[in-house]
Curated annotation (Swiss-Prot):
Biological processes, Gene Ontology terms: DNA recombination; DNA repair; DNA replication
Chain positions of motif Important for interaction with partner proteins: 155-160
Stretches with biased composition (Polar residues): 130-144
InterPro entries associated with the record: NA-bd_OB-fold, Primosome_PriB/ssb, ssDNA-bd
Quaternary data: Homotetramer.
Classification of source organism: Bacteria, Bacillati, Bacillota, Bacilli, Bacillales
Low complexity composition-biased segments: 115-129
Keyword DNA damage among UniProt keywords: yes
Keywords: DNA damage, DNA recombination, DNA repair, DNA replication, DNA-binding
GO cellular component: nucleoid
Gene: ssb2
The protein's name in its UniProt record: Single-stranded DNA-binding protein 2
C-alpha cells in the first residue's frame, strides 16, 4: 500500500505554531494548489489543502513562511476525528508533511520566505560534513550563461 502526497502551492495565511503539553512543536497551514485544468468558464480553480508539520520543521515553517509564500510539501494523507464542544463527531483530512521546501528566495516580495530547505528524513546526509571544494569568486557566477554567441555542439554528442 502507498500513501504519498507531493504538493506545490502558496500559503493562504501565516502558519499557526503551537506546542503540545509535552513541548513538541506543531505547525498547521493551508496550501492553495492550482488545478491542472480549467472550469467551464476557462478559469483555473484551486484546492485548499490543510497541512500539519511537527518538531523542528514546524518551527522553521512558522519562522520562514508567511501568507503567499510558495512551498513544496512531501508527506502523507491522514484522516482523524474528534468530538467538538457540541458533542458532534468532526472528521479532518490533512496532509502530514514529512518535508517542507521553501521555494522562494529570501529577498522575494513575500517577507520572510527563504530558499533553505529543511528535510525531516533520517537518510538526509551532508548535515555535518565539510566540503573541501572552494568556489573561485573571480569566475562568472553562471558558467552556462550565453554571451550571445552560438554554441558549437556536435549533434553526435547529444543524447537524444
Amino acid at each position: 500500500m502507498m500513501n504519498r502526497v507531493v504538493l506545490v502551492g502558496r500559503l493562504t495565511k501565516d502558519p499557526d505554531l503551537r506546542y503540545t503539553p509535552a513541548g513538541v512543536a506543531v505547525a498547521t497551514f493551508t496550501l492553495a494548489v492550482n488545478r491542472t485544468f480549467t472550469n467551464q468558464n476557462g478559469e483555473r480553480e484551486a484546492d485548499f489543502i490543510n497541512c500539519v508539520v511537527w518538531r523542528k520543521p514546524a518551527e522553521n515553517v512558522a519562522n520562514f513562511l508567511k501568507k503567499g509564500s510558495m512551498a513544496g510539501v512531501d508527506g502523507r494523507v491522514q484522516t482523524r476525528n474528534y468530538e467538538d464542544n457540541d458533542g458532534k463527531r468532526v472528521f479532518v483530512t490533512e496532509v502530514v508533511a514529512e518535508s517542507v521546501q521553501f521555494l522562494e528566495p529570501k529577498n522575494n516580495n513575500v517577507e520572510g520566505a527563504t530558499s533553505n530547505n529543511y528535510q525531516n528524513k533520517a537518510n538526509y546526509s551532508n548535515n555535518n560534513q565539510t566540503s573541501s571544494y572552494r568556489a573561485d569568486t573571480s569566475q562568472k557566477s553562471d558558467s552556462f550563461a550565453s554571451e550571445g554567441k552560438p554554441i558549437d555542439i556536435n549533434e553526435d554528442d547529444l543524447p537524444f
